[in-house]
């Protein structure tokens, strides 16, 4: 989309539920009428529309999200895909179809047929060539791809996110903000990397680069955990695993020790993910991630103490799921690997008591049934 002319740049500040999520910065291609409509709806400068609502994206939501396709918003009148209004009136014609839907993060007009453009738009998350000739591409995301991915991967019901994805602020970028709009900036932990490897910019990814990035993400996760931000810590550990998954095995030109380093890091990230998932009461995930850690423990040459932690973490998850018998089995394995560990000993006592209490309750119920 190279063009010598200075293109408008706009932004959305996104909130998911009550959580501030981040900024999406967009650059508008010179499809003049379509781009001007979108720019003005970002600033709200046109005032009230014919439907009695402000011609402004602020406060509107992304009402339709389909993973591996797109995220859609812009209905600031009905909030459900049936409304919206352009600055020219309710609808305006398709301007041109010169730009193709050939990559993710393109900005395109939603419509209900030829010549029905209003205010609704979508951002692609994959190439969507079947939309060529039907929808007008008029911009692209230049920053905040991780925010788009976060929205794309939300839980939905009938394609609507279960939590509102709200544009809490929006507008046009000018001056230094314009110049800085496409610059990657680290988040609060210092993490400068895109959430998904497919969106990575900079040095080409290979096994060594992915190991380096995943190692840094583990450190960012540890720092978030120590600061008390468990959800962010878990997010960084899982992000690290995504980067490792890009190149699960080194190639023949990589250093020989890299294979063992990757396996050890994968074990640690799974085990740490289990720890934080349990603390967040995500016991199903906690058990799964501890199991993944244990599945890789021998290949990773994990120490007995670290394997004991993984068994312990899976036991805590099983206890949280009220599956105390499974928890006890894992705790007994952990005790073999780390005899005398006070945490394991205490958890065994706790689980045995839970089993005893459950059995007593079952006996009482049976006696009442047969009396």
Curated annotation (Swiss-Prot):
Record bears the keyword Isomerase: yes
InterPro entries xref list: Cyclophilin-like_dom_sf (IPR029000), Cyclophilin-type_PPIase_CS (IPR020892), Cyclophilin-type_PPIase_dom (IPR002130), TPR-like_helical_dom_sf (IPR011990), TPR_rpt (IPR019734)
Pfam families in the record: Pro_isomerase
Domain PPIase cyclophilin-type: 11-172
Alphabetic keyword roster: Cytoplasm, Isomerase, Repeat, Rotamase, TPR repeat
Domain of life: Eukaryota
Segments for region (Disordered): 175-195
GO biological process: protein refolding
GO CC annotation terms, alphabetical: cytoplasm; intracellular membrane-bounded organelle
EC number: 5.2.1.8
TPR repeat coordinates: 214-247, 267-300, 308-341
Any one GO MF annotation of this record: peptidyl-prolyl cis-trans isomerase activity
Coiled-coil region: none
PROSITE patterns: CSA_PPIASE_1 (PS00170), CSA_PPIASE_2 (PS50072), TPR (PS50005), TPR_REGION (PS50293)
Stated family: Belongs to the cyclophilin-type PPIase family. PPIase D subfamily.
Protein function: PPIases accelerate the folding of proteins. It catalyzes the cis-trans isomerization of proline imidic peptide bonds in oligopeptides.
Name of the protein in its database record: Peptidyl-prolyl cis-trans isomerase D
Organism: Aspergillus oryzae (strain ATCC 42149 / RIB 40)
Underlying gene: cpr6
